[in-house]
Amino acid sequence: MALLVFITIGCSDDFLELNPQDQITQANFPESPEDALLATNAMYQVLRDARYHRGFFPIDDIMSDDALKGSNPGDALATVGPFETFEFNTSNEFLQNWWQTLYLGIRRTNVVLDRVPPIDIEESLKNRYLGEARFLRALFYSDLARGYGGVPLILTGTTDGTIQRASLEDTYTAIESDLRRAINLLPEKSDYRSDDLGRATRGAARALLSRVYLYQQQWDSAVFFAEEVINSGQYSLEPVYENAFDENFEHGIESVFEIGGIGVQGDINAGQNGYTAAQGVRGTPNRGFGFNRPSLDLINSFEANDPRMEATVIFLGETLDGIFIEGDPLTADVDDTGQPETYNQKVWTPGETVFSNREHNRRIIRYAEVLLNAAEAYAENENAVQALSYLEQVRARAREGNATILPEITETNPDALLDLIFEERRHELAMEGFRFWDLVRSGRAPAVLGPLGFQTDKHELLPIPQLERDITNNNLVQNQGWE
């Protein structure tokens, strides 16, 4: 099977500015130190593939109460629309593309892990390549585990031809193993040169492991790895919330892991435009297709004068960076439910008017999430003092010096405190792909999402794409409710 390999093109922006160069068979690649770098860089390209992001926002945001399909009313009704109403099926194109793209990433990490060890490279550099591969493989598998449950574990470049689902426990064990090994192999963020920022780091591996343990309700382990990040001295919160998403603060002090956003002109699948253009303002100014619009429910859920609402939602009539937002003439300014025409401000790209070559980085792990992971795990362990301390750090930054808003939370009842932490996660991490999974893992989904079409014992997991089941002669057992 051919492996598409990418090389750096010498621009000073970052190592992820990549172009297609050649096709080299896995049988003879990589062999040299130069090949090892190319193979390592090729893993990251999957994160920038439009098909990766086309799975992200319909599943992670539009299936929640935070976002709507968006675009104009008739656009993508058969592909994106069903995620808003829980009417998608096992043949949905976006689900299929997401599954295949995640396994493409896994395949590329396996090439590095299988073939880089024998290459004669300086040991610390080789360790870094292997650590990057283990982190990225864990990231891809964590998306699969969260979305589908137990999935096929393909941990080498070759298989015996029999592909079956592993248990969820075994899937998470593989993820944890990769991340623990990555922690020992990777450098800290501060050890990288500026042109290598965006590569996996020890802090990113620890932060992802904290998230993975949180999702498994292993509170002590979630606390341990969150504290490792907190105490590393590598990260802190940006003083101004909206700067955490600003182009001028990419790879900044709050960024634990983000995807570089230099796209390839003219290649819609290779570029980061799959993330920004899909969600950009539709109509005037022409910034994108307008999918994944913040919902009225999300807007109304913010506390009074919370700056994070304005930093998350673009409204018609606003002026951003000197550009007036008129919106889409095919979309009602306010529909019959009271929903205004809105857009996701966290993907706003100043001065950009074309779909390709978008330069907005996507933040995958922020330090704020790590603080909230710790707060939640401490609250679950009934340590309200520590939980409130980390919760207050997040809220204090959100105030931006205005003592009259977002009062400090003092609740110590465990259940009530957890409710407040989940609300804080909703507002701090809005439109970043957490809300649906937070509702599912906390048991809140039936009550919150039931009116939108969510069915208990079905929609907690996505369906295995039918095409994948056909390829494996139905060896992949379908998830409950999707048979």
PLM regions with names:
Residues Y275-R293:
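Short, cationic low-complexity segments
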Residues C11-D60, G70, T79, T85-G274, ...:
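Acidic/polar-rich alpha-helix caps and helix-coil junctions
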Residues R293, D297-L298, D306-R308:
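Conserved, charge-rich beta-strand/loop surface module that forms ligand/interface-binding patches
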Residues M1-I9:
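Sec-dependent bacterial lipoprotein signal peptides
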